[in-house]
């Protein structure tokens, strides 16, 4: 299904690229662990709130910006289980929302299937294209850093990016081997989107 020609897309100055199945799984793990810890029910993560937090962690500051959110998922997965809104085709793809402080966020979702182009390969291809696009100033990537070699391959791609004007941030659940990019912890944005406050987990 990967008929996307990433070279012909008009990219925004800010681009978030995420393995959506992975962030959905991490959100589930956080819900299970924190419900036990704080002894209350936790609602699914707010997709808009999560995207705003990722953009802030990626260096975006207040202003009338445009940010693209690229959600890459397995074709079999029709909807996210631990985020709202959830359904890729009906609720997320080609949708947009406006944040009072950071401007417009435009969401696209792309289903992938292994026999065509695998999800990791597709994510790396999008990341490579975006990082080589002059107009893009900030790139935030959330690969599956726990299974497979997507993170290491991404590090290798980013090593070759020669653009001092670009701010590239990779997100993972724990500090990972560094490279030609910044690192942030994925858990903070997810906890915020799940409505878990720092006070509750002291």
Language-model features and meaning:
Residues 1-12:
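Acidic, polar low-complexity linker/tail segments
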Residues 2, 18, 145:
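Single, functionally critical "micro-switch" positions that shape active/binding sites
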Residues 2-3, 125-128, 155:
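A generic local structural motif
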Residues 11-15, 20-25, 32, 36-140, ...:
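A charged nuclease-like catalytic/ligand-binding cleft shared by nucleic-acid processing domains
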Residues 129-134, 155-167:
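Short, surface-exposed basic-aromatic patches at helix termini and helix-loop junctions that form
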Residues 139-150, 154-158:
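Acidic, metal-binding active-site segment of PIN/NYN-like and related structure-specific nucleases
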Residues 161-195:
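Short, flexible loop segments at boundaries between secondary-structure elements
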